[in-house]
Amino acid sequence: MRIKGILTGTLLFFMASCEGHPSATASFHIEPIRIQRFDQALFKALESADGGLELRQQYPAMLQLFGMGVLNRRSIDDELFFERIRSYYAEPTLHKLYADALHQYVDVTELEQQLTKAFAFLKEQLPDLQVPVICMHVSGLSQNVLVGDSLLSLSIDKYLGVDYPLYDNYFPPVQRVRMTPQQVSTDYLLGWLMASYPFDGNESVLLERMIYEGKLRYIVSQALGGKEGVDTLAYPEVVEQWCEQHEADMWQQII
């Protein structure tokens, strides 16, 4: 499935609809999305002597994906696998980060509703797009998005708000502005679209990559209700104004 033909055709349809302002209301219906709380299950398992066995039974595919993506462990059947997880999250700062993430995302009902509407919209425009099983995990500020054959998970510890104290030590301000709960739905959708329609252009040509990501962000903005592109980028207004004032210089540097 080639990204250029599919996304270009979709964009042309969007731009032709309602004089360039397509409706974000989907007539296509999907099963309501229920986020699988792997994050909660793992935290509970860490406090139980036989929690590893229960977690393997409840989330085998997600545990495998998590082990490979976060811990670089390929087999969940390794007898030391869960001990490695337990040791990883025993570090006090990481343990507090985990607890804070769970507290922030106790109720995900609104997020589930947003994702249900957004995926229904995407499914209507891109019929071949698979709707994934959606999970949450806590990576310890490492692997943000985990993607399997039919599985998508986001690391919620990276969406605790721009002022979360620990972020100051690891992320610059321009990155922290996107580490908010408001960015979660956008990054779920972008992560899945990028996995479903991977970039097939020339990685050495920045402009090709920009066009690719711009197409995806435009589609995501429409799926989330027609927000302007700057919202999906999550940059503050002062950054947007600077870009507008220096647009010619920016393009000169890029091209």
Regions found by a protein language model. Give the residues of each.
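Bacterial N-terminal signal peptides that target proteins for export
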Residues: M1-L7
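Short, well-ordered helical secondary-structure segments
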Residues: G5, T25, H29, I76, ...
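Hydrophobic helical h-region of N-terminal Sec-dependent signal peptides
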Residues: T8-L12
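C-terminal motif of bacterial Sec signal peptides marking the signal peptidase cleavage site
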Residues: F14-S17
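N-terminal mature-domain "stem" immediately C-terminal to a signal peptide or N-terminal signal-anchor/transmembrane
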Residues: E19-S87
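Acidic/His-rich structured neighborhood in mature extracellular/periplasmic domains
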Residues: R86-A248, Q252-I255
